[in-house]
Amino acid sequence: MINRDVYFDAVRDSMFEGSMSQQQVDGQNVIVALWDYQATGTPMTDIRWLAYILATVYHECATRMWPVTEYGSDSYLKGKPYYPYHGRGFVQLTWEENYRNAGIALGLIDDRDLVKHPDVALDSLIAARIMFRGMSEGWYTGRKLGQYFNDNEDDPVNARQIINGNDDDELIAGYHTKFLDALQGAMGRV
């Protein structure tokens, strides 16, 4: 389990210049709580995975740590070939097929059906579940967390390929290091 007080004290200084909004705290709480819940009996026991997930959210959501909608005006988004399935979430889910597949994988039906109600991907818990499954199972590019963080690999630079080629890979790897330091301290593993 991650000691939230220790974790937040560390990231507040290292990542958020001394203060965080309630939304930034809430978003991280959702992610860390889901991690704690899923870590039992699953491959998600390598804390480097969580550090990389948090680093990715920090980058993809422009430090907000909360699910976002793809940036752009309504007319811009309506011009996208995948509209109305434009980017939503902690990590941008796009295209109808991906909304459908994520919804099926997570068992989302009725008023939570992602195809009928794409804004459901902005719900913080659902966005976190999509991101965890997507990054661990290779939904975005075919690349998975386990390829970059395992007994033989520790590669936060190339892990960017899980989401988006190598754009800002060194920058995100630096975020990963800071989140990892905070998490290890919060677990008594310094």
Model-found features: residue ranges?
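N-terminal secretory targeting signals
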Residues: 1-2, 190
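Peptidoglycan-targeting cell-wall enzymes and recognition modules
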Residues: 2-29, 39, 44, 48-135
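Structured secondary-structure scaffolds
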Residues: 33-35
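Surface-exposed helix-capping loop/turn segments at secondary-structure junctions
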Residues: 38-44, 139-148, 187-190
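Acidic helix/loop microenvironments that form the catalytic cleft of cell-wall polysaccharide enzymes
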Residues: 57-60, 146-168
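GST-like fold's C-terminal all-alpha helical module
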Residues: 128-151, 155
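Low-complexity, Gly/Ser/Thr/Pro-rich intrinsically disordered linker/tail segments
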Residues: 164-190
